[in-house]
Amino acid sequence: MSDRIGLFAGSFDPVTNGHVDIIRRASGLFDKLYVGLFYNKDKTGLFEPARRQIMLKEALGDLKNVEVVAARDSLAVDIARQHQVTHLVRGLRNAQDLEYEANLAFFNSQLAKEIETVFLLTALDYRYFSSSRIRELIHFGADISPYVPQGVVKEVGKKCENKQKI
């Protein structure tokens, strides 16, 4: 039997505890799990991709079968093919996510029939977490420590100390 290889793609700006939970759970389902750090043309970034990659690696360092890969101008299915991925992993928080993700899964299946999409329901504790909401909290100086890995809290602190625009 061939290896089961997953790809969980996102912009992770910033990575949240909800992302980490999905990745941890997905890592148990696959022999190898790639976490694809993608550029989302529809989102305004808070952190540079290189900084996001560092934060992801720090948050996931104990997961031996997980590797973070960066992809700027690529489709997830193209990166999946490069890494012999068998399954795309997507997290679902609510019905709105399902509608969006079902549409994405349809197009991915049209582009790469050999790659299956699997959905993991977000744990109840993380159901309302989103990177965009975290960015809003950061903008207004709220405490984000309950929602993100400690490395993200530290990076936000550095940005604030350096008086960089948030």
Swiss-Prot record:
Cofactor(s) the protein requires to work: Mg(2+)
Binding site for ATP: 11-12, 19, 91-93, 101, 126-132
Sorted UniProt keywords: ATP-binding, Coenzyme A biosynthesis, Cytoplasm, Magnesium, Nucleotide-binding, Nucleotidyltransferase, Transferase
Residues noted as binding substrate in the record, renumbered to the chain: 11, 43, 76, 90
Catalyzed reactions: (R)-4'-phosphopantetheine + ATP + H(+) = 3'-dephospho-CoA + diphosphate
Site keyed Transition state stabilizer: positions: 19
Gene3D superfamilies: HUPs
InterPro entries documented for this protein: Cyt_trans-like (IPR004821), PPAT (IPR001980), Rossmann-like_a/b/a_fold (IPR014729)
A GO MF label: pantetheine-phosphate adenylyltransferase activity
EC number: 2.7.7.3
GO biological process, one term: coenzyme A biosynthetic process
GO cellular component, one term: cytoplasm
UniProt pathway: Cofactor biosynthesis; coenzyme A biosynthesis; CoA from (R)-pantothenate: step 4/5
Localization annotation: Cytoplasm
Parts forming coiled coils: none
Top EC class, one word: transferase
Function comment: Reversibly transfers an adenylyl group from ATP to 4'-phosphopantetheine, yielding dephospho-CoA (dPCoA) and pyrophosphate.
Record note on quaternary structure: Homohexamer.
Entry similarity comment: Belongs to the bacterial CoaD family.
Name the UniProt record assigns to this protein: Phosphopantetheine adenylyltransferase
Species of provenance: Streptococcus mutans serotype c (strain ATCC 700610 / UA159)
